[in-house]
Amino acid sequence: MDRRSYIKHAGIAGVLAAGTAPAVYAQAAVRWRLSSSFPKALDTIFGAAETISKRVAAATGGKFTIQVFAAGEIVPGLQAMDAVKDGTVDCCHTAPYYYFGKDATFAFGCAIPFGMNARQQNAWMYHGGGMALMREFYARYNVIHFPAGNTGAQMGGWFRREIKTVADLKGLKFHVLQSRRREI
């Protein structure tokens, strides 16, 4: 291709590309509502949803905004995922262990006592097939699962004596969800 032909074709391509730009900017703004399972007082955890909201708005030039609501402002905190499933809100920020009562499989997507640490959980999720398994599971609830943080392993307890055998657990109190105490 000679120089004149190249310049001609490049010019035509430039005009066509410039003509399509207004169509992109003419798209309607997207506004979502996010229900959190956490109160504003838990600023580290609740703040994570606010940070995601700000980053999405910044990355899209304000064309996609997510309004974050604390637990109880739209639905009770433990019903955030149900609100997404039912179409009450567009998305939620929650912890899967709140939904053990629906299915114990939710345990694999979050921190639980004696479970994986943060690095192990992330490795499984992002490199060990965990994301695909969790998405398949969440599809049953009409929800798409996106991990958005990791609080690390949940402690089973702090004890005055060393735990060496199962018998050492007898009579100890644990920090675990009420609905799953009997299973541990």
Give the residues covered by each predicted segment.
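Contiguous mixed-secondary-structure segments that line small-molecule binding/active-site clefts
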Residues: 53-54, 85, 95-184
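Immediate post-signal peptide segment of exported/extracytoplasmic ligand-binding proteins
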Residues: 21-37, 50, 57-65, 139, ...
